[in-house]
């Protein structure tokens, strides 16, 4: 997000949906200009961005801005007046982020209390969304951007730090199912577009997690290190000292060259933009 010229050249599935006639809106209780976020969203096709500036001052109750309940309320109001065009609405929560100052007091542990608050807000939102006519054709995708900081003090080189869920709910989901495929946020683009029968050829690093014919793996990175995991091997590599710092599975070491190659391809792609 900090390199607008490079971002401008990226293929973006949100922009693709806008070109397909989708109505795009983004809802966030914090500062939409934080780290170039607004520029990134506009480039991605979002022409309506709701942020802390769009809420009454009395709702700005936390360090991050407006608590989640008011953000979900704003989203619901927008959905209630939404025209019959296809839409993509994105809600970014923030109340479960430290310092955990939320208008909710049910658990003694402030961290768990904040998690419970966001969970309660989301549950209420889904319950209200089910009452709208649009529910029967709506897909809600729930996914975090990073670990939730619980249990406390998880080491950077602990695989559990990067194990996050992705949950699909909504009237558009035909039946309950559990997907065991390995993947990462990179794969959301191809997976969703495939379900919508839209091309995802432009997203060279993304793969359809529901396609049994492709190799499923998860890639993640953090400053000066990367991880590459699948059902056979999970490896983490420290690029500073050129050492494997974690490796587990039936085929230890198997994914190291794949992880290195993936990282190199990412840098090559970034350098050309």
Tell me what each language-model feature is.
Residues 1-273:
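Solvent-exposed soluble domains appended to multi-pass membrane proteins
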């Amino acid at each position: 997000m900090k390199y607008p010229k490079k971002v401008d050249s990226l293929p973006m599935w949100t922009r693709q949906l806008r070109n397909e006639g989708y109505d795009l809106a983004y809802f966030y209780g914090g500062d939409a200009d934080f780290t170039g976020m607004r520029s990134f969203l506009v480039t991605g096709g979002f022409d309506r961005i709701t942020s802390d500036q769009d809420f009454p001052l009395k709702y700005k109750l936390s360090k991050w801005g407006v608590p989640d309940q008011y953000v979900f309320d704003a989203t619901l109001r927008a959905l209630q007046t939404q025209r019959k065009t296809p839409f993509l609405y994105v809600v970014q929560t923030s109340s479960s982020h430290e310092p955990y100052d939320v208008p909710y007091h049910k658990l003694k542990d402030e961290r768990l209390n904040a998690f419970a608050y966001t969970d309660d807000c989301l549950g209420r939102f889904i319950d209200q969304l089910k009452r709208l006519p649009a529910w029967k054709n709506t897909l809600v995708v729930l996914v975090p951007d990073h670990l939730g900081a619980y249990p406390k003090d998880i080491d950077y080189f602990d695989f559990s730090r990067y194990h996050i869920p992705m949950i699909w709910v909504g009237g558009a989901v035909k039946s309950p199912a559990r997907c065991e495929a390995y993947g990462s946020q990179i794969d959301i683009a191809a997976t969703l577009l495939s379900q919508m029968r839209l091309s995802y050829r432009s997203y060279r690093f993304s793969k359809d997690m529901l396609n049994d014919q492709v190799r499923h793996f998860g890639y993640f990175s953090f400053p000066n290190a990367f991880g590459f995991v699948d059902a056979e091997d999970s490896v983490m590599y420290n690029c500073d000292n050129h050492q494997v710092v974690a490796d587990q599975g039936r085929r230890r070491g198997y994914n190291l060259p794949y992880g290195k190659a993936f990282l190199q391809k990412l840098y090559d792609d970034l350098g050309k933009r």
